[in-house]
Amino acid sequence: SDIIRHNALGNPFWITELQGGNVTASGNVPYCPTAAHTAQYLWTAIASGAEGVIFWSLNQRAAVMEAGEWGLLDFLRRPSDRMLEAAKVASVLQRHGEEFRGLKPAPAPVTLLYNIASLRIQRRNAETLASGEEGRQASACMKSLAAAYEAVSAWGVTPEVADMATFDWDDAAGRTAVIPHMVALPSEFRPRIESFVRNGGKLIVTGLSGFYDENMRCLFMNGFPLKSCFGAEVSEFKVAGEYFTLGEELPAHLWRGIL
């Protein structure tokens, strides 16, 4: 929901196609939301500022693709536990509409950043794979972002998620930006990153972030352009095992960076 909110650029937004029920043959991953998950998804959307949520779907298709899947109603056309839970959330909103109206999400001190170039390049690299390591899959960048979300949340802070193109780099004081395994750092963002750090923002970078520019040139060759901002430059990355530990307690995956 944060991704949608930031890309709405301050405009009202809805969240659509929230999963209503079980999937069997469709969907990338077999999954059925529990009633508790449904409530969590709805309240998360509301807390992010969404003005509405649309499920996919109320009832299942009867034939062909997605037949018997995704519905809030069961096969007997009775409300599922998910639909009953959604009704409870709607009831709270109806009873306390005036209290919710006009509320806006409080800005978080930590923002997790992604960029489209990283997703495109990661997907392109994954097309040639013969092995199954997570860090080399097309989903690696966004899974790293999800892992960072879990890690920051475990500290007691709920982070925001934003595209680098919509992040307010000028609002640096007291803020932390995390770039989790974003394999590309397009040239347009480099002066913004430097300005953010220079003006007091804290920057945390993980994985192979900045390995490429937007044209898939390796940035670590011929002088890393963000050396002064990052405080160091990488001389090389070495495969160190699928899972290993950096120092005494920092879990890592696949590559070890040598400074």
Regions found by a protein language model. Give the residues of each.
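Short low-complexity, flexible loop/linker segments enriched in glycine and/or proline
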Residues: 29-32, 67-72, 174-179, 218-222
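Short, solvent-exposed loop/turn segments at secondary-structure junctions
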Residues: 19-23, 59-61, 116-119, 166-167, ...
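Alpha-helical scaffold elements within enzyme catalytic domains, especially in hydrolases
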Residues: 3-6, 44, 151, 192-196
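Hydrophobic targeting/anchoring helices
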Residues: 1-142, 236-241, 245-251, 255
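Loop/turn elements at helix/coil->beta-strand transitions in domains of secreted/extracellular proteins
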Residues: 9-13, 48-53, 155-160, 173-175, ...
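Generic beta-strand/beta-sheet core signal
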Residues: 16, 56, 113, 162, ...
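A conserved amphipathic helix/loop scaffold
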Residues: 34, 180-259
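A short, well-structured beta->alpha microelement
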Residues: 149-170
